[in-house]
Swiss-Prot record:
It holds the Pfam family DNA_primase_S. Belongs to the eukaryotic-type primase small subunit family. The active site is at residues 94, 96, 274. GO terms for biological process: DNA replication, synthesis of primer. InterPro entries: DNA_primase_S, DNA_primase_ssu_euk/arc, DNA_primase_ssu_PriS. One of its GO terms (cellular component) is primosome complex. The lineage of its organism: Archaea, Methanobacteriati, Methanobacteriota, Methanomada group, Methanobacteria. This is DNA primase small subunit PriS. Catalytic subunit of DNA primase, an RNA polymerase that catalyzes the synthesis of short RNA molecules used as primers for DNA polymerase during DNA replication. The small subunit contains the primase catalytic core and has DNA synthesis activity on its own. Binding to the large subunit stabilizes and modulates the activity, increasing the rate of DNA synthesis while decreasing the length of the DNA fragments, and conferring RNA synthesis capability. The DNA polymerase activity may enable DNA primase to also catalyze primer extension after primer synthesis. May also play a role in DNA repair. Keywords: DNA replication, DNA-directed RNA polymerase, Magnesium, Manganese, Metal-binding, Nucleotidyltransferase, Primosome, Transcription, Transferase.
Length: 324
């Protein structure tokens, strides 16, 4: 499993297994407003600016060409063939299992463990998008070696790159929450509240992600501002976090080193998501239902994110016939 598909296998997939029924409704209903791109030789999507008026013409193309990869734009255009008259674009969070900076599996590519970790991460992101931001037109797609969160709420679809960047930083936990609060009503005093003492809002988002990262450290990760001694102590004292005893953990790590830790993990949080994809208004993504030929997996919409298992649901028939 996870080996490259041959041309013969690609042809078999698109002629025997691929179906328009596997394409999500949110893709099908506006097919003619999107740009398509194709990679025919594994060197990137050089065949761009394609347009299909309906699913049948797309079906014929895929069966005839059996592309190495198929892509579709997140943007909607009145003239997609020229990428002109942009209307709006999906808001995307792209999490690739092989690019997660803290991976407990330590594998070289993708495996069952890091794919499971990627699903945990996107589930957490979706919960924040729904609970904190009130977004609800959200679709999850398994890309073949990670996940795409595709958001179609109108307020995000029509937003620009600046707002998308700010939302990304909030949802990802990409900044350390401020701890000093000034209250002019109480003798102009300043109060200090650590992020872990505020169990709501952004402080909770950051604390939850910080805890998740710390608990998944193996010990050999190379992270800015975390030297080997600090890494060793983080792992030594992280048992405090099993019961959310953050005060004890910070005490044993030390205030200055704890600051280094939180700043490093804020950067880790942001690097877990491909930020370029999130702010790009004209990005093309893998077409749900297409084949990810590098790893021989289906790119598909996830119907139930709590129970989805890519090794059971996204494996093409030709992989099973290999006997892998």
């Amino acid at each position: 499993m996870f080996s490259k598909a041959t041309l013969k296998e690609r042809r078999q997939y698109y002629r025997e297994e691929w179906s328009t029924k596997d394409m999500p409704d949110f893709i099908l209903k506006d097919l003619k407003k999107r740009e398509f791109g194709f990679d025919h030789n594994g060197k990137g999507p050089n065949d761009r600016y394609k347009v299909f008026r309906g699913s049948e013409s797309l079906k014929k193309f895929l069966r005839y060409k059996a592309p190495f990869a198929a892509y579709i734009s997140v943007a909607f255009y009145n003239n997609p063939r020229r990428r002109e008259d942009w209307q709006k674009a999906e808001y995307i969070f792209d999490v690739d299992a092989k690019d997660i900076p803290i991976r407990s599996c330590q594998c070289d590519g993708v495996c069952e463990v890091c794919l499971g970790q990627a699903l945990e991460i996107v589930n957490s992101l979706i919960d924040t998008l729904q609970d904190d931001l009130g977004l609800n037109n959200i679709h999850l797609v398994y890309s073949g070696r990670g996940y795409h969160i595709r958001i179609l709420d109108e307020e995000m679809m029509t937003s620009g790159s600046e707002l998308r960047s700010e939302v990304l930083k909030y949802v990802a936990g990409a900044e350390v929450p401020k701890s000093n609060f000034f209250n002019p009503d109480i003798s102009n005093k300043s109060f200090n509240f650590e992020h872990f003492s505020i169990p709501v809002g952004y402080s909770k988002i950051f604390t939850d992600k910080l805890k998740y990262n710390i608990q998944h450290l193996v010990g050999n990760e190379e992270l800015d501002e975390i030297n080997p001694k600090l890494m060793k102590d983080i792992i030594k004292y992280r048992h405090h976090l099993d019961n959310d005893n953050w005060g004890y953990f910070k005490r044993d790590i030390g205030p200055r080193r704890y600051k280094n830790l939180t700043e490093a993990m804020a950067r880790v949080n942001l690097s877990t998501i491909d930020a370029k994809v999130s702010i790009d208004l004209k990005r093309i993504l893998r077409l749900p239902s297409s084949l990810h030929s590098k790893v021989s997996m289906k790119c598909m919409e996830v119907k139930n994110r709590e129970t989805f298992d890519p090794l059971q649901e996204a494996v093409p028939k030709f992989v099973e016939e290999r006997g892998e």
